[in-house]
């Protein structure tokens, strides 16, 4: 269960399950310029992260299928579903994803977490998406009933 300070945050949270299937891709860092150019027209939800070792992409599987021919070397994993926590989270908020991660870990559900400036998102294997939503909705309902 979340801390008493976190209960109202979870009680106010809505979940959004994105309808598309997604792929997580790792490209060699040398392909950064090509990746940034090719992925300019990506539609939401998508993400590009560049670090010293790789270019990591999250995009709709249908978009990746059209573009992967440009990259002879890559690693990828799919299908994933994206779940957005539809609540604006203050950057000073501590522990939101740790609560989510712990509850889902107890259920044997692995997550890939993505944070943006305003919201957090998780990716789960598509076959686990419905169960993940159920577990998270139960958490939200428990927080709502405790808050009342």
Model-predicted regions and their roles:
Residues 1-103, 131-148:
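Regulatory modules associated with amino-acid/nitrogen control
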Residues 93-127:
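A structural feature that tracks compact, well-ordered secondary-structure segments
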């Amino acid at each position: 269960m979340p801390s008493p300070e976190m209960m109202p945050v979870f009680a106010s949270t809505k979940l959004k399950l994105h309808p598309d299937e997604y792929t997580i891709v790792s490209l060699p860092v040398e392909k950064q310029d090509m990746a940034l150019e090719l992925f300019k027209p990506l539609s939401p939800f998508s993400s590009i992260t560049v670090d010293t070792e790789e270019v990591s992409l999250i995009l709709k599987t249908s978009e990746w299928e059209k573009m992967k021919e440009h990259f002879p070397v890559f690693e990828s994993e799919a299908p994933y579903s994206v779940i957005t926590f539809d609540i604006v989270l203050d950057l000073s908020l501590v522990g939101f994803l740790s609560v989510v991660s712990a509850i889902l870990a107890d259920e044997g559900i692995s997550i890939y977490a993505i944070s943006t400036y305003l919201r957090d998102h998780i990716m789960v294997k598509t076959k686990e998406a419905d169960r993940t939503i159920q577990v998270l909705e139960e958490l939200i309902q428990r927080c709502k009933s405790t808050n009342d």
